[in-house]
Amino acid sequence: MKKRVNIIIPAITINLELLKCLKEINKIYYSNFFVTIVLNYDSKIKIPRFKYKINKLLAGKINMSKKRNDAVKKFKSKYIAFIDSDAYPNPNWLKYGINYLIKKKADVVGGPGIPFPKQNYAEKISYLSKRSYFV
């Protein structure tokens, strides 16, 4: 039986980047997961239906670390996966990550952030600069 995973996404509010992220999560090749989005404030933008459950937690204006911690405490699961609202996962992300955790008896698995494929030049530069150790 697949272990349950809580994918936690901290964000300021529901926006187009978050909706893209949720759409890509819908393509994951792993069935036993749910998503928790942790927001500063609610939005009038509706979240479409996906094949997975989405929990929404309104946390107010707090930092991303606190948002992640609050989501871990509120919505329990065997495993926790973090992703930013401006990123999207490889479809095998959870499958490979969980297999690695089990086989290697590891506690943490990290992975690359993948930018959206159709970003314009300015968006790509912004994405790369946010992830650079030299900035």
Predicted regions, residues:
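Glycine-rich, basic loop-to-helix element that forms the pyrophosphate-binding segment
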Residues: A59-F75
